[in-house]
Amino acid sequence: MMKANVKECPGADRIEGYGMNLLDPTAQFPDGKHFDIIWMSQFLDCFSPEQIESILTRAAQIMDGDSRLCIMETFWDRQRFETSAMCLTLTSVYFTAIANGDSKMYHSSDMDEIVRRSGLEVEVIHDGIGYGHSIMVCRKNR
């Protein structure tokens, strides 16, 4: 689906996908070349902090000094309106209690801590993407 969606976009020849079981801690990201961007959009919130750390640690292993890892999520503390934050925290209760027991909408400082434990650091956070998303841009620790 990703390939079909970007087929006509400028730079489509530079966009690659790689299928893998991210929850398998032995599954390695593709190695042996430079990656400008590793894009993780709205799925890390489906996992526990330990699972996220495993995913990000393995991603960090293939990054170089010029690579960036972008995490797009709806961090409840970075919402423009208090009602938006409340809706996200209530959604978090649903996911944690009913859906799978791991999912939750993270506070950005909690994700920042997981990022740091993974060998990365947050370079910048872009807020106000769409209706309430933020993009956390990460790089390898110096």
Which residue stretches match the model-derived regions?
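Alpha-helical subdomain
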Residues: 1-142
